[in-house]
């Protein structure tokens, strides 16, 4: 089990929190002690179209020089430059495929092996069945792209942000319907708690298909500062022999945060638990 930190609180997403260049975020996160870094493929850090070949090589060298691995990547969220895999617009779904292709290639270039699949949301006037089918069809195609680069796609249930894949059963159903060996599962503790469910239950339900985990206490606080039971989560992960990354996705819930502080606090709390 390894610890990773997501770059959102260093990137001005989704609100105008302090913004730092990607290389600065990498150095700070590595200095704290994290094994990995999860990079959002969005401006200002890593929107693929904004990164020329020289810049890509530069970031890979910075990762190597600081002894930190790319644990995972995820695309720009919906809205703005983002996209909806379940969109009724064929053009938007096509853009989703192009964007995922670019994110997968970038992830592989930087030594990463995991990309998060955000299934999208049902738009008014579209049936849930149709929205689901569009998202499923998209993931089938994306999984083939990822397989060519040795990348695993992980389906994330997002109760706070979507109305399509909200819980554990939804994610498992999507994975099973796609049926690709490189499509696995993940969960974020804040989404589980939003549904008034128990995060450690997700560990047991996902079992051997659990590939990645996001750690966040209530209100995107560092673990140990809200109501989350992370001792039980880690104990459950040990029981199922989880060997992936626990990524802190925290600290972007308000403007006046200090990203180094929340990163240190999360590491100090989680490191003794994982050993």
Labelled PLM ranges:
Residues 107-127, 149-158:
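Active-site groove signature of glycoside hydrolases
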Residues 222-223, 245, 254-258:
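Short active-site-adjacent structural elements
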Residues 36, 130-132, 136-235:
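Acidic/histidine-rich catalytic cores of soluble enzymes
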Residues 230-246:
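Short glycine/proline-rich, acidic loop/turn segments that cap or connect secondary-structure elements
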Residues 1-112, 140, 147, 180, ...:
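N-terminal pre-domain/capping segments
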Residues 86-91, 121-131, 157-163:
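Surface-exposed cleft-lining segments at the edges of enzyme active sites
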Residues 3-7, 37-39, 70-75, 115-117, ...:
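Hydrophobic faces of well-ordered beta-strands that scaffold small-molecule active sites
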Residues 9-11, 41-43, 76-79, 119-123, ...:
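Active-site-proximal loop/turn and secondary-structure-junction residues that shape catalytic pockets
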């Amino acid at each position: 089990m390894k610890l990773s930190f997501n770059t959102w609180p260093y990137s001005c997403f989704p609100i105008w929190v302090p913004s730092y260049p990607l290389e600065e975020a990498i150095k700070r996160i590595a200095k704290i002690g994290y094994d990995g870094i999860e990079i959002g493929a969005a401006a200002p850090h890593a929107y693929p179209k904004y990164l020329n070949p020289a810049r890509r090589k530069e970031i890979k060298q910075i990762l190597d020089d600081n002894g930190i691995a790319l644990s995972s990547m995820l695309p720009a969220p919906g809205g703005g430059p983002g996209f909806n895999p379940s969109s009724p617009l064929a053009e938007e779904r096509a853009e989703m495929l192009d964007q995922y292709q670019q994110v997968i290639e970038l992830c592989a270039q930087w030594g990463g092996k995991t990309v998060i699949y955000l299934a999208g949301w049902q738009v008014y006037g579209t049936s849930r069945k149709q929205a689901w089918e569009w998202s499923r069809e998209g993931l089938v195609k994306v999984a083939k792209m990822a397989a060519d680069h040795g990348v695993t796609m992980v389906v994330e249930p997002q109760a706070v942000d979507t109305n399509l894949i909200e819980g554990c059963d939804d994610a498992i159903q999507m994975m099973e319907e796609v049926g690709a060996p490189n499509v696995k599962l993940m969960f974020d503790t804040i989404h589980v708690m939003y549904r008034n469910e128990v995060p450690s239950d997700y560990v047991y339900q996902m079992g051997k298909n659990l590939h990645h985990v996001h750690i966040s206490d209530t209100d995107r606080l560092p673990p140990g500062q809200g109501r989350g039971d992370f001792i039980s989560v880690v104990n459950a992960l040990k029981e199922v022999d989880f060997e992936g990354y626990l990524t802190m996705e925290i600290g972007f819930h308000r403007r006046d945060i200090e990203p180094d502080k929340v990163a240190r606090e999360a590491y100090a709390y989680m490191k003794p638990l994982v050993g």
